[in-house]
Curated annotation (Swiss-Prot):
One GO MF term attached to the UniProt entry: catalase activity
Pfam family for this entry, one: peroxidase
Catalytic reaction equation(s): H2O2 + AH2 = A + 2 H2O; 2 H2O2 = O2 + 2 H2O
Post-translational events: Formation of the three residue Trp-Tyr-Met cross-link is important for the catalase, but not the peroxidase activity of the enzyme.
Protein name (Swiss-Prot/TrEMBL): Catalase-peroxidase
Family: Belongs to the peroxidase family. Peroxidase/catalase subfamily.
A single GO cellular-component term on record: cytosol
Biological-process GO terms, alphabetical: cellular response to hydrogen peroxide; hydrogen peroxide catabolic process
Primary gene name: katG
Enzyme Commission (EC) number: 1.11.1.21
Length: 779
């Protein structure tokens, strides 16, 4: 039988040459990318793919593979682009970390002479290099932009992005159009990184460089915390559905930005500085600004302060035709050594440099802190003009040439602004804040200092992770504060007695397990938020989340609070927090369930959690942590879903820092323990609910049953002989039989000799989730 083969093209963003002239034109055009793309599939954008294998996949000659005659060998995802990927669960493992298992970054950072680093960074700011000369003789503006763009990828929806891991070093971020020429900033920092080595990470150094840049230009920052450990490979992260730089297929309806995205176009940090899709409309741009900054956890005042504060320094670069700019770092030649955007416009350096295509300097003192941004913004009327590179920008009408040139002291320029700068004057809410900052420079300075600190530290998690002598003493609400332990902790004997009381309280195994899981599984390894510490499950908004079963939750918490009150009243200096009791209840239930399945296991428990108050909890800030879907509890909420159930399950597992085997064993265990949300029976493939058996895997892989779709989108397992319905399940259940790798894990736990291993592996993974936010244990 002849097989018809189809030639396909598989463009990869990491190897794509950037046409800067096209980028400028695409600011006002929509890009084209394949249909049907799903959230976790953005790395492989297949055009013209069919069910038949691709005949050829072409690569640039510079990347020839000796084993394939110069052609790239297709990966599984090229053949089956809709296949669920679980690669994200195994990213940045010890196998890719050159520092070794014993390396403790926090310990190394504590030995760092931070003042010496700051001194070296301060000297760097004015040490202009011929290979990349400093604007106005000062690298401050460049370093601020580098730090801002390192942190600015953060998004509240899933907590991903941000400065916390030094991801700007890797593709795709190192080659985003919005990060053009930040490769130069990192190269300027290399001698300092080389000098201090493992004592300071790239992630910390990039943020610190931004802080020192501000301080060196006369601005008083709010503080700095170290503690961002580097990773060694890029995240597999969904940045958008587009297949071209600056594409904007992420909108629907009346410009509704798709979640979880935080930027308006592929390859931008926030918004298009020329306005939406390059249209120079400051009012429309204000809408984009408000939405994107909100998605990075910033309110209107913080937004105005950040834009104006950042644009008090430095300049943009658009000296000439963007088509003369060469490829980004990931598309460069070997001899370029990771430096990109080499320009053929005149010298390509200094006054001839091209980055964004815009040519704007905002203030008369671009290397000194001032209120001149607001002074110029309100002093002049503005007319639309073009940069030398053809980009839309604004020039002050009838103004004198008062703005210094970055490299020629004999030259002056008229004041210029970006479309997005004018939004701060023309949007009514932004205008009110901007005018207040104009009239009250001290308020502006304080707001910018706080907003900058928040921008660069938002993804670091609780203050226990902050390191160094410059950590501010003030506790901020967005840090999700939890009281320090102020009492003697319970002993092993107390723990055993409390377990007995909990199990005798009338609460069932499913109730205790589901409550503990609901409390702990809010944790996000991305921005280190959530988790069981603080017992915020008893507070708004978590107590009212549908997935947490408010009625059952209230019952469980009521009984646990009674046990807590009784113990604390009679134990002298010892106290137990509700946060600890919630976890201990789940731990006791797991041990009982294992025993009921014929396996004795001791589940590790470490006290020391504390209870946060409602006043210490910003309800609006916690709202994004509410799951749209939670495959561990077989829950799909009413809000719009942007992932399939199995994709959402893997996504949540990655946020919980789980591996593929841990994901598998936890789902199988939680199903038989009856931890599904709202009493759902889907995936509860056992007749012994509450016993920690391997029944889920045994019955899922049982060939005497046949699965088929049901009318409501779930699935039914029917007996092959009688056609009777034996079980029901969801996509989050069936994926463990359908996905070859997950099935391989499931088979391990379905064997007749795996019962003890299953229980022990479940207990270990359970403890891991319960302790994800226990940063105090590693201190």
């Amino acid at each position: 039988m002849a097989v018809t083969r189809q030639r396909v093209e598989i463009p990869e963003l990491a190897h794509r040459h950037v046409d800067h002239q096209k980028i400028l034109s695409q600011r006002s055009l929509k890009s084209t990318s394949p249909d049907g793309m799903r959230g976790l599939e953005w790395f492989y954008l297949v055009k013209g793919a069919s069910s038949t294998p691709p005949e050829e996949v072409f690569m640039d000659d510079t990347s020839k593979c000796p084993f394939s005659g110069g052609k790239r060998v297709p990966a599984n995802r090229d053949w089956w682009p809709t296949q669920l990927s679980i690669e994200m669960l195994h990213k940045n493992s010890g196998l890719s970390d050159p520092m070794g298992e014993e390396f403790d970054y926090a310990k190394e950072f504590k030995t760092l002479d931070l003042n010496a680093v700051i001194k070296d960074l301060t000297a760097l700011m004015t040490d202009s290099q011929e290979w990349w000369p400093a604007d106005f003789g000062h690298y401050g503006g460049l370093m601020i932009r580098m730090a801002w763009h390192s942190a600015g990828t953060y998004r509240i929806t899933d907590g991903r992005g941000g400065a916390g891991a030094g991801q700007q070093r890797f593709a795709p971020l190192n080659s985003w159009p919005d990060n053009a020429n930040l490769d130069k900033a990192r190269r300027l920092l290399w001698p300092i990184k080389q000098k201090y080595g493992r004592k300071i990470s790239w992630a910390d150094l990039m943020v610190l460089a931004g802080n020192v840049a501000l301080e060196s230009m006369g601005f008083k920052t709010f503080g700095f915390a170290g503690g961002r450990a580097d990773v060694w490979e890029p995240e597999e992260l969904y940045w958008g559905p587009e297949g071209t730089w600056l594409g904007d297929e992420r909108y629907s309806g009346e410009r509704q930005l798709a979640e979880p995205l935080g930027a308006v176009q592929m390859g931008l940090i926030y918004v298009n500085p020329e306005g939406p899709n390059g249209k120079p409309d400051p009012i429309a741009a204000a809408k984009d600004i408000r939405e994107t900054f909100f998605r990075m956890a910033m309110n209107d005042e913080e937004t105005v302060a950040l834009i104006a504060g950042g644009h008090t320094f430095g300049k943009t670069h658009g000296a000439g035709d963007p088509s003369l700019v060469g490829p980004e770092p990931e598309a460069g030649a070997l001899e370029d050594q990771g430096l990109g955007w080499k320009s053929k416009h005149a010298s390509g350096l200094a006054g001839d440099s091209i980055t964004s295509g815009l040519e704007v300097t905002w203030t008369t003192t671009p290397t000194k802190w001032s209120n001149n941004f607001f002074e110029n913004l309100f002093k002049y009327e503005w007319e639309l003009t073009k940069s030398p590179g053809g980009a839309n920008q604004w020039t002050a009408k009838g103004a004198e040439a008062i703005i210094p040139d970055a490299f020629d002291k004999s030259k002056k320029h008229r004041p210029t602004m970006l479309t997005t700068d004018l939004s701060l004057r023309l949007d009514p809410a932004y205008e009110k804040i901007s005018r207040r900052f104009l009239e009250n420079p001290d308020q502006f300075a304080d707001a910018f200092a706080r907003a900058w600190f928040k921008l660069t530290h938002r993804d670091m998690g609780p203050i226990q992770r902050y390191l160094g002598p410059l950590v501010p003493k003030e506790t901020l609400i967005w840090q999700d504060p939890i009281p320090a332990v102020n009492h003697e902790l319970v002993s092993d004997q107390d723990i055993a007695a409390l377990k007995t009381k909990i199990l005798a309280s009338g609460l069932s195994v499913p109730e205790l397990v589901s409550t503990a899981w609901a409390s702990a599984s809010t944790f996000r390894g991305s921005d280190k938020r959530g988790g069981a510490n603080g017992a915020r499950i008893r507070l708004s908004p978590q107590k009212d989340w549908e997935v947490n079963q408010p009625a059952q939750l209230s019952k469980v918490l009521g009984k646990l609070e009674a046990i807590q009150k009784e113990f604390n009243a009679s134990a002298g200096a010892k106290k137990v927090s509700l946060a600890d009791l919630i976890v201990l209840g789940g731990t006791a239930a797991v041990e009982k369930a294992a025993k009921d399945a014929g396996v004795d296991v001791k589940v590790a428990f470490t006290p020391g959690r504390m209870d946060a108050s409602q006043e210490q909890t910003d309800a609006a800030s916690f709202a994004p942590l509410e799951p749209r879907a939670d495959g561990f509890r077989n829950y799909v909420g009413k809000r719009q879903q942007f992932l399939q159930q199995e994709e959402a399950l893997v996504d949540r597992a990655q946020l919980l820092k789980l591996t593929g085997p841990e994901l598998t064993v936890l789902v199988g265990g939680l199903r038989v323990l009856g931890a599904n949300a709202n009493g759902s029976k889907h995936g509860v493939l056992t007749a012994k609910v509450g016993a920690l058996s391997n029944d889920f895997f045994v019955n899922l892989l049982d060939m005497s049953t046949q699965w088929a779709p049901a009318a409501d989108g779930t699935y039914e397992a029917r007996d092959r002989k009688t056609n009777a319905v034996k079980w029901t399940g969801t996509r989050a259940d069936l994926i463990f039989g359908a996905h070859s790798q997950l099935r391989a894990y499931a088979e391990v736990y379905a064997t007749s000799d795996s019962k003890e291993q299953f229980v022990k592996d479940f207990a270990k993974a359970w403890t891991k989730v319960m302790n994800l936010d226990r940063f105090d244990l590693a201190a």
